[in-house]
Amino acid sequence: MRIIIESITPEMRRTYDYDNLERVYAEYQNRVVDDEPVMSSFASKMAGKKVLLLAPGVTLRTESDRVQKYIAHENPIVIGVNHVPDDYRCNCFFFANAQRYQYAVDTNANEMRRADVIVTSNVRSVKVGANVVNFNLLAKRGWRFFDNGTIMALRFLRKVGVMDVAFAGFDGFPAEDSRLCYANRVFQNDLSMELKRAINEDVLSMLRDFQALDKGMTKLSFVTSSL
């Protein structure tokens, strides 16, 4: 939905009330749930542990040796963000996107049942057993693309006491339009280069904002080539 809104030309935005539609989109995401038991449970499981976030970028395939070596050496909690990655065994999955969540349920039901699943409250059709956390607890306004799943997962980890986070597959969109962006080709899209650059800029800005507010308390590292 957000990508559709952002791809509309200024002329079309003046003709139709798309700015109001964007406000409605943000309000729709805001479904409040009692997530205190979930936060407390994951604080007990994860606080003080190393965590590896597997974003869906293509480097999960092209740099898989580096990722597997990191997992073998560091023994982190492995979390798939907005996807169930091939060739990696995850301890947990984090979803902030309804379409990606449903795709995972439909195509990887066994993995979704085996591991812990964390879902933000904007995802409405949640299966029994998923751990729902408040979208607005993890989303921060001030950017066009404020609902990036990896950034939201990072904020979740900070709130449950994780102080050592590594990223893999956190690639961003490539400068060359023809290059694959995702480890799973199903997720490929035809966004304009202008829109891809804007998304990259927002994600980088949100990451820097996290670091500024965190004041260096959380160790961040990148296992694969990144933004």
Region roles according to the model:
Residues 1-227:
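Metal-ion/cofactor- or nucleotide/acyl-coenzyme-handling active-site neighborhoods
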